[in-house]
Amino acid sequence: SALYTVVWATYSVGFTMVPTLYMNNEISYEHDFNRKMEKVCRAFANSLDQAAVSALEAGKTQILKDKLNYNFAANVIEVPTQMATEIMGDINPIMRANCYPGLVHVVGNAGIDSLIKKLAQHGIYNDVNKRMEYENKVFHYTNNVVNEASKNGTFFAVEDGNVGVLTRVDREALNRT
């Protein structure tokens, strides 16, 4: 394994709660706190998601040892529409050729979610069993992965353990200064 430089980002949030505003009010202090906390959590999760997608975009592979039947240009595998249902099954051999034989995590957008749902319609008791295309992967969906013009779906394939979040609390925050 290689030595990586960890880039830290500081995230901080806050909101105001004034107890006297909730006296004689239909909205309780707890209800308003929970609503505000939910907004903060969603915004924080979206910020982390955007940072993760940016890291995936910046770290795309530049070399494919075996691109199978696909075109590979500008660090992107172009999938023809007629092969859209096959790419999920082909990701494992492509990753294995680049020495990533482990469990694959797929980070995709709504177009990939739609593709997986269409593949799932062809299960074990249907006309064609398409489960092998997608069943040995872990899927994560986000609206922060965007399609290029005239594309139906975009995803990143990452081996398990290659992307993560480290938590570090600044000393000043621990000391409340």
Predicted regions and their residues:
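Sequence/fold signature of self-assembling virion shell proteins
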Residues: 79, 117-177
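Flexible, glycine/threonine- and acidic-rich loop/arm segments that mediate assembly and lattice contacts
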Residues: 1-100, 112-125
